């Protein structure tokens, strides 16, 4: 596990964008795993800037998003489908049929999960997987207690995640969906060739310390990343402040 400490959020975004840019320049038909939430927004802004500068061509790139709320249509303003189009896809030259986001509004959620898992497998896995981390150590919607053998599946959101995400729903936790489709931990670990985890802010400091330096435990789902052979953590100073060491290999 390699840990990079960024001086500030803007540097975090530039460092992570550089990894993606290098991957696409090396392999035009790269497969990217993407995340939502506030942390990757700056990364996507940087990628848009690089695209507009002619430094990245997304025309052959394929993407898979980590997760999606159950019960929200793709056009719902708080759906992750809407988020991704607003913050990235509508600003770059992605082919629409190369964009994959779990179908949260599919009445057959279990079947949709299997289809999604199969699509990732058929794509040959994910070259670079972007992850955020929850204050409770979750990755995707794999909450504490999630089995490390889980594949893409329907998950129940924890109360802490519902409260954390309420800010996207006008501050009202009642409006936050209780279920979501998420890549499972096994999916992420097995299919991702390079995992890039982003963390910003002091509210992530405990999770980052436990993820990197604590025991591997389902109580901290992100701790399983210690077992992956190619992980880059990019954290700003506030998120990294509780690490005992910033040098890992």
Swiss-Prot record:
Q: List the disulfide bonds.
A: none
Q: Which pathway?
A: Amino-sugar metabolism; N-acetylneuraminate degradation; D-fructose 6-phosphate from N-acetylneuraminate: step 5/5
Q: Where is the active site?
A: 67, 136, 138, 143
The annotated phenotype of a deletion mutant is:
Deletion of the gene prevents nearly all growth on glucosamine and severely reduces growth on N-acetylglucosamine. The gamA-nagB double mutant cannot grow on glucosamine or N-acetylglucosamine.
Q: Which EC class is the enzyme in?
A: hydrolase
Coiled coil residues, start to end: none
Q: Does the keyword Hydrolase apply?
A: yes
PANTHER family found in the cross-reference section:
GLUCOSAMINE-6-PHOSPHATE ISOMERASE
UniProt lists the family membership as follows: Belongs to the glucosamine/galactosamine-6-phosphate isomerase family. NagB subfamily.
Q: What is this protein called?
A: Glucosamine-6-phosphate deaminase 2
Organism lineage string = Bacteria, Bacillati, Bacillota, Bacilli, Bacillales
């Amino acid at each position: 596990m390699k840990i990079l400490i960024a001086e500030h959020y803007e540097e975090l975004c530039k460092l992570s964008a550089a990894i993606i840019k290098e991957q696409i320049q090396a392999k035009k038909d790269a497969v990217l795993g993407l995340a939502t939430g506030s942390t990757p927004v700056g990364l996507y802004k940087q990628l848009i800037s690089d695209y507009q500068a002619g430094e990245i061509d997304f025309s052959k790139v394929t993407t898979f998003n980590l997760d999606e709320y159950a019960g929200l249509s793709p056009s719902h303003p708080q759906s992750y489908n809407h988020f991704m189009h607003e913050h990235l896809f509508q600003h770059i030259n992605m082919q629409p049929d190369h964009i994959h986001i779990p179908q949260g509004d599919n009445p057959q959620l279990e079947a949709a999960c299997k289809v999604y898992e199969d699509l990732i497998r058929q794509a040959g896995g994910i070259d670079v997987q972007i992850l955020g981390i929850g204050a409770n150590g979750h990755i995707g919607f794999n909450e504490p207690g999630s089995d490390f053998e889980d594949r893409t599946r329907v998950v129940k959101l924890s109360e802490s995640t519902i409260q954390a995400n309420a800010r996207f729903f006008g501050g009202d936790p009642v409006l936050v969906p209780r279920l979501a489709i998420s890549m499972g931990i096994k999916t992420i670990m097995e299919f991702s060739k390079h995992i890039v985890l982003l963390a910003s802010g002091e509210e992530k400091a405990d999770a980052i310390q436990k993820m990197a330096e604590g025991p591997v435990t389902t109580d901290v789902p992100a701790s399983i990343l210690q077992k992956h052979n190619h992980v880059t953590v990019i954290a700003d100073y506030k998120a990294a402040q509780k690490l005992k060491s910033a040098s890992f290999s």
